[in-house]
Amino acid sequence: MIDFRENWRIILLVIVVIVSLFALVSPTLASGPDSNSAVVQQSSQTNLQYGLELAGGTRVRAPLVGVTAEEVEFEPANAREVEQRIATAIDGAGPADVIARPVTETTGTVEVTVEGVSTTELQSILESTGYTASTVRTGVTETTRQEVVRILENKINEAGLSGGTVQEVTTAGGGHFILIEVPNEDAASVRSLVSERGTVVVQAHYPQDDIYTQQTVLQQDNFQSIGSAQEGQSGGAYVPVTVRESAANEFQQATVDTTLARPGGTRCTYSRDQNSTEPCLLLVVNGEVTNSFGMAPRLADSLRGGSWAQDPVFQLQTANVSEAQEVAINLRAGALPAKLDLTGDDGGTTSFISPSQGENFRTDSLLAGLVAVFAVSGVVFLRYRDARVALPMIVTALSEVLILLGFAAGIGYPLDLSVIAGFITVIGTGVDDLVIIADEVLAEGGVSSRRVFQSRFRRAFWVIGAAAATTIIAMSPLAILSLGDLQGFAIFTILGVLVGVLITRPAYGDILRALTTGNL
């Protein structure tokens, strides 16, 4: 008669294995055709999903062009002036190539994203224009990198490239790169996609003869600068926009003619009802309305009075910073605030893996895993020459891999070569721990009772627990930091260690106890 209370660890292992098998093969967990997860290809027999290395596609890894001056002394209200003055001092640069971002009430950062500008040159330009900075370094700010990631994600999604991912990765030396992975696309298409510019226009939406009509009031090249999202002093957020002087008068007159600049301003309800709203400004990106805005009374008064064209700046108000960031992205119509350095001089690389090569990698990975299993099995049988000890050891170790595969399938984590390496590592470390258990239990002769077994097993488990803690601590930085492929390796190595310590090692202990003492 099986004592379920004494063998609950074995029962737990069986349950977890069954759940993992369900996650692997159940059609109810299969990703639909519209899934937008970081997936390149899904196995037809299982729910496993493969990354670029095992399925094919293009990977672009490149830094951003730019130099940044930190702790530059200027007030937030003067950010646009800073951009214009510094841009004027740089040959071939416009205000859009300079980003002045307030950090405190008296200082901020200044980024120049023109190719060929060195830190020494930016330092000299700042001094010649009357500004001082504490440090000038190569690279852009974290805010700019995050904005680039969001813009590229939008571009990939709009292009209909299912499974494309964009993320920021950091090297061990502190370098920052943008990593783009797009499935089933060649390198030339991906490079063109991430560098091309969309189209954006601003239209006036207003009633004319009882029929609502749209009139374009600003073209893409009418913008002199598009600021970053900023928090408002009285709540909400906004995006500051500067219009070129050559287009300012025409825009000013258009807002009057379309009744946008009416006394008291306008309240836009376009998102709720397009045919009953007061006049609105519509932001149209690639032919699609992405945002709508009313007009503040003060701005309407300056437009009607004709004074606005002398200082052609206005703010697009939003409810929160997140929405303002989306507006800034839409205004740029896919234009990056800083270019990707695809020349390769500073570490930028583009790689393409054909689908056939990815299939070969899958086959080779499977063979490597089988070789690891048979090699470990052979060594274990040679070591113990006792199937009662060796066979459960191999089955338990393989169950760890099965559990990890089920976990990967359940959450839709794409498998790549680094994850496969993690699985092979789990097999090795798992069997190593099981050998420690078997040696400790059997080293002092036969096991005469359950009490003797438990005493020896506890000693072995302390050693295993200490080794597991060391592995987790060592792998944690790789799992937390954005280090590309190393992250997947570290994550699944840590998961394998946790599964082993919490589930499979205790279960193997119960199996070994039952086989050596004859008590279930």
UniProtKB/Swiss-Prot annotation:
It is found in: Cell membrane. The chain crosses the membrane at residues 10-30, 364-384, 391-411, 417-437, 461-481, 483-503. It is a multi-pass membrane protein. Pfam families: SecD_SecF_C (PF02355). GO terms for cellular component: plasma membrane. InterPro entries: SecD/SecF_arch_bac, SecD_arc, SecD_SecF_C. GO terms for biological process: intracellular protein transmembrane transport; protein targeting. It comes from the Archaea. Keywords: Cell membrane, Membrane, Protein transport, Translocation, Transmembrane, Transmembrane helix, Transport. PANTHER family: PROTEIN TRANSLOCASE SUBUNIT SECD (PTHR30081:SF1), PROTEIN-EXPORT MEMBRANE PROTEIN SEC (PTHR30081). HAMAP family: SecD_A (MF_01463_A). Part of the protein translocation apparatus. Forms a complex with SecF. Involved in protein export. This is Protein-export membrane protein SecD.
